[in-house]
A protein has these predicted regions:
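Hydrophobic alpha-helical bundle signature of multipass membrane enzymes
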Residues: 6-200, 221-227, 231, 248
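Catalytic phosphate/nucleotide-handling subdomain of diverse soluble enzymes
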Residues: 216-218
Length: 249
């Protein structure tokens, strides 16, 4: 099968399953808000060729532990319509704090319910944007362009921007507003999440970078939203009280 046929087959498969993505609604954002996400590199571009070579290099050097941890990261997501009583509700709440999980035992949904609600609402906005632009760009997965890539996960939707990268960086930038002294840790966790998708061959580096940029623009945009700022203030108060309780400066 030629490369054009492979691309069209993959796009057809993808379009058959995106219906639920197109029905997502944001929480804080207005649906008509535009973001400055750039077009992905063309499939035949020199950048895409270079990124495919990079992914092949990652494939040749990745260890079993790299794959194991990356496949674990693949399970870290938030189902935006989750609710108390759902069998995965506890896990979804835990996933909200995957970024920054190492900074303190109290940095979790159980200890910070208002912060957890804020993060969940931001994930709704991020999910809306992710699917909006995945549906718009319909970028082919790297392993569909180069069959020498042995992807460790099968994904039947578009690559650009990376959902894991967008969500993780959105968390990182949001948490940096709440706990700026830990910003380096948050950004490192988000980078590791984004890079894990490259390690297992399902995302180009430009997918990760577009997700980072989209997340940064999202948080900056939300800082102009009065409802978000009100919820952010409540989360800051909640976190400050817990820091005082645990003897943090």
């Amino acid at each position: 099968m030629g490369s054009c046929s492979i691309i069209m087959t993959a796009i057809t498969e993808y379009k058959e399953i995106i219906g639920n993505g197109t029905t997502r609604k944001p929480h804080y954002l207005a649906t008509r808000e535009a973001f400055s996400i750039q077009d992905p590199p063309a499939n035949s571009s020199e950048q895409t060729k270079a990124e495919l070579l990079y992914l092949l290099q990652l494939q040749s050097t990745r260890s079993a532990e790299d794959v194991r941890s990356s496949m674990y990261f693949a399970t870290v997501y938030y189902r935006v319509n989750t609710k108390p009583g759902d069998k995965d509700y506890t896990q979804m709440q835990r996933n909200l704090f995957h970024i920054g999980r190492s900074i303190a035992p109290w940095f979790c949904a159980d200890s910070l319910p208002m912060t957890a609600a804020l993060v969940a609402n931001v994930w709704k906005d991020a999910a809306y944007l992710i699917w909006k632009y995945k549906n718009y760009f319909v970028r082919i997965r790297p392993y569909k362009l180069d069959t020498n890539l042995k992807n460790q996960e099968e994904t039947n939707w578009a690559a650009y921007p990376s959902g894991h990268a967008t969500n993780s960086y959105a968390n990182a930038y949001l948490f940096s507003e709440l706990l700026p002294e830990f910003a380096t840790y948050f950004i490192k966790d988000a980078y590791d999440m984004a890079h894990s998708r490259e390690i297992i061959g399902v995302h180009y580096p430009s997918d990760s970078e577009s997700g980072r940029q989209l997340a940064k623009e999202l948080i900056n945009r939300l800082k102009l939203n009065s409802n978000f700022l009100s919820d952010l203030s409540k989360a800051k108060t909640e976190i400050h009280a817990l820091k005082v309780k645990h003897g943090y400066p």
